[in-house]
Amino acid sequence: IESAIADFQPEIIINQITDLKNVDMAANTKVRVEGSKNLIDAAQKYNVKKVIAQSIGFMYEAGEGLATEETPLDLESSGDRKVTVDGVIGLEEETSRMDEYVVLRFGWLYGPGTWYGKDGMIYNQFVDGNVTLSDGVTSFVHLDDAVETSIQALNFDNGIYNVADDEPVKGSDFAEWYKQQLNVDPEINIQPAQPFERGITNDKFKAQGGKLIYSTWKDGMNPIK
């Protein structure tokens, strides 16, 4: 990382590094914590002006209603979720060492190459005929919007911003819509929602002038690619 930054001498860095190919939460947390520390160390050494970091918006504590940026993270969690929360904390604390920084807490990403795109994990469950989903509330954001928002964030004030569309959705409602899009009729097993599956607001993001291409996942997933 340091040699790349030394060579390119960038003014701004957008940190979107993850390690999710094998759904290994420990590996992804290591990247978020250690990778972010190394990145910020190098950024400060070579006078990078601003860092924009990709975080996630579904690690808030349990509660009623949509979570805001002021909602505490789920520090009382356990297992893989606690590992992921620790990674989010590490990423965001390291990023905030910069004089100028923005953290984007994205909702669940969808689009080509994701779980919800063609041949993705969720897509394949529906096609194969056996679906298991939680009835919790999900806030989505399209991959294209994640890219676009990262550019918009160049002009955001320092801080943390939830980034998701305007239509949080329960798992049961999503499943009914998604199966109709695919014209399939799988066996759908809806699990009870977890208290932390609550979705997120995007008011703070909009107050900075943030705009999405897809204000609802129904537009972004039609058709499913």
Where do the language-model regions lie?
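Mid/C-terminal beta-alpha module of Rossmann-like enzyme folds, strongest
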Residues: 147-196
